[in-house]
Amino acid sequence: MSIMKPTTRFFRFNSLELAVSPFQRIYGQLRFLRKQPKPFLVKLLNNEVSKLGRQGDVVSVTRGYYRNTLFPKKQAIAVDALKSMKAHLLQGSEFSTKTKE
């Protein structure tokens, strides 16, 4: 019984011959399919959080920390939601000034 070696294929790249095994080819394709790290989210703190900041500070936190710790305890709010609330309040104040005149 003979031991079979993985076959290799030769490719020319910049006039160099490179031997690529099927395992290397599959690993190279899987490398791009791995999950990328999730970006940090910017949050506004509702009250003081130890090691993070004081009330009113805008901080960057990971999605998991916000979802599992800050959001259930109502210690932080998303900045995007805050911007939309400010816009809504500004529209309401413009409406109230128009009705008073």
From Swiss-Prot:
Top-level taxon: Eukaryota
GO molecular function, one term: structural constituent of ribosome
Principal location class: mitochondrion
Subcellular location, record wording: Mitochondrion
GO cellular component: mitochondrial large ribosomal subunit; mitochondrion
Keywords from the named record: Mitochondrion, Ribonucleoprotein, Ribosomal protein, Transit peptide
Residues of the transit peptide: 1-32
Example GO BP: mitochondrial translation
One Pfam family recorded for the sequence: Ribosomal_L9_N
Record family assignment: Belongs to the bacterial ribosomal protein bL9 family.
Complex formation: Component of the mitochondrial large ribosomal subunit (mt-LSU). Mature yeast 74S mitochondrial ribosomes consist of a small (37S) and a large (54S) subunit. The 37S small subunit contains a 15S ribosomal RNA (15S mt-rRNA) and at least 32 different proteins. The 54S large subunit contains a 21S rRNA (21S mt-rRNA) and at least 45 different proteins.
Purpose of the protein: Component of the mitochondrial ribosome (mitoribosome), a dedicated translation machinery responsible for the synthesis of mitochondrial genome-encoded proteins, including at least some of the essential transmembrane subunits of the mitochondrial respiratory chain. The mitoribosomes are attached to the mitochondrial inner membrane and translation products are cotranslationally integrated into the membrane.
The protein, known as: Large ribosomal subunit protein bL9m
Species annotation: Schizosaccharomyces pombe (strain 972 / ATCC 24843)
